[in-house]
Amino acid sequence: MAEEVPSINIEEWKPRTSIGNLVKNGKISSIKELFDRNLPITEPEIVDVLLPKLKYEVVDIKVVQKQTDAGEISRYKVLVIMGNMDGYVSIGTGKAKQLRVAIQKAIRDAKMNILPVRRGCGSWQCTCGEPHSLPFKVVGKAGSVEVNLLPAPKGTGLVVGSVLKTLLTYAGIRDAWSTTKGETRTTENFVRAGYSALYNTYNFVTLQDWARKR
């Protein structure tokens, strides 16, 4: 179930990095500008300012044990998917003794991993030209899992696994097919492989990109 990312008081934010200062002072006014300038997200508050009204969903909760001198200590490990449903998506993990704290840490981690996703109409069966799917086939890997994402015609929907469907929905992709290899029952690796595939949408230079550069 999607929930809104808790907002912060921007006035109380004291940036710790030069990029954070640029954002707070209005020298960088959009998340697109940040990525166009090839600048990293150095503080989670940068995302709060440039990409408000994000939503997130907890997709995996595990109880993990850590061996200490005092014995085993149990902690929660949480995996969340975050996005604006319109071209930006992320994943994050967090560990803590309390579930609420683990979720907060996962949200903070996800803000640091925000990714722009290139969308398009890459299926030969569709010529609408709208950004409803992927521009081309992309592949992502994590552990033993490999995910292939393929563009689909408008109206197809997301013909993918349930967790992958959540990831693509948060990225703003409405139509896609997928094929997978490996141990897809491992939720974290499955999600990370899908995230890696979406990252690769910007690893290819299209003819349109060349035209814009010339």
From Swiss-Prot:
PROSITE patterns: RIBOSOMAL_S5, S5_DSRBD
Record has Zinc as a keyword: no
Boundaries of every S5 DRBM domain copy: 54-117
One GO CC term on file: cytosolic small ribosomal subunit
InterPro entries named among the record's database cross-references: Ribosomal_Su5_D2-typ_SF, Ribosomal_uS5, Ribosomal_uS5_arc, Ribosomal_uS5_C, Ribosomal_uS5_euk/arc, Ribosomal_uS5_N, Ribosomal_uS5_N_CS, Ribsml_uS5_D2-typ_fold_subgr
GO biological process: translation
Keywords, ordered alphabetically: Ribonucleoprotein, Ribosomal protein, RNA-binding, rRNA-binding
Presence of the UniProt keyword Ribosomal protein in the record: yes
Domain of life: Archaea
A molecular function GO annotation: structural constituent of ribosome
Coiled-coil ranges (or none): none
Assembly information from the UniProt record: Part of the 30S ribosomal subunit. Contacts protein S4.
Domain notes: The N-terminal domain interacts with the head of the 30S subunit; the C-terminal domain interacts with the body and contacts protein S4. The interaction surface between S4 and S5 is involved in control of translational fidelity.
Homology family: Belongs to the universal ribosomal protein uS5 family.
NCBIfam families the record matches: PRK04044.1, uS5_euk_arch
Stated role: With S4 and S12 plays an important role in translational accuracy.
Name of the protein in its database record: Small ribosomal subunit protein uS5
Gene that this polypeptide is encoded by: rps5
